[in-house]
């Protein structure tokens, strides 16, 4: 197993073990996300009938701002974690350049050991 894959698995296990401890004890379960157009249309339709001075619970702009900021915050965290995992799981684009297996002049012996010049020319390497 490659070292990068081993590190990625270890990090995944570490993140999964930390995940339940980060959960807040009083948070309600997340609701399924709706498309952005419908999300904006529903609060405007519900809040359009209320007057400016109305102090009813659950209505008004404060709740709308809170919902929007929560959605944006969740989206931002999700994007950051996806980018981090993508960097961990994908090798460097020029990784082939750093691997020594495809360079000229690197002859491999019988057991993967590099043969010296004399052994490779005389055939006594194996």
UniProtKB/Swiss-Prot annotation:
Biased composition (Pro residues): 26-35
Positions of the propeptide segment: 24-73
Location relative to the cell: Secreted
Region (Disordered): 19-71
Cysteine-cysteine disulfides: 110-126
Single annotated GO MF: hormone activity
Pfam families noted in UniProt: ANP
This protein's record includes keyword Cytoplasm: no
The keyword Ion transport belongs to this UniProt entry's keyword annotation: no
One GO process term, biological-process aspect: negative regulation of neuron apoptotic process
Predominant location category: secreted
Annotated signal sequence range: 1-23
Annotated keywords: Cleavage on pair of basic residues, Disulfide bond, Hormone, Osteogenesis, Secreted, Signal, Vasoactive
GO cellular component entries: extracellular space; protein-containing complex; secretory granule
InterPro entries (UniProt xref): C_natriurtcpep, Natr_peptide, Natr_peptide_CS
Family matches, as PANTHER family: C-TYPE NATRIURETIC PEPTIDE
Similarity annotation: Belongs to the natriuretic peptide family.
Name listed for the protein in its UniProt record: C-type natriuretic peptide
Lineage: Eukaryota, Metazoa, Chordata, Craniata, Vertebrata
């Amino acid at each position: 197993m490659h070292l990068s894959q081993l590190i990625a698995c270890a990090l995944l296990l570490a993140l999964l073990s930390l995940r339940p401890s980060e959960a807040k004890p009083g948070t309600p379960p997340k609701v399924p996300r709706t498309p952005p157009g419908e999300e904006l249309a529903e609060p405007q339709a519900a809040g359009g009938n209320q007057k400016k001075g109305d102090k009813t619970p659950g209505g008004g702009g404060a709740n709308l701002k809170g919902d929007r900021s929560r959605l944006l915050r969740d989206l931002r965290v999700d994007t950051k974690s996806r980018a981090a995992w993508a960097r961990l799981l994908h090798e460097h684009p020029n990784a082939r350049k750093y691997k020594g297996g495809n360079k000229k002049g690197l002859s491999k012996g019988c057991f993967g050991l590099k043969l010296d010049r004399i052994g490779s020319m005389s055939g006594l390497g194996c």
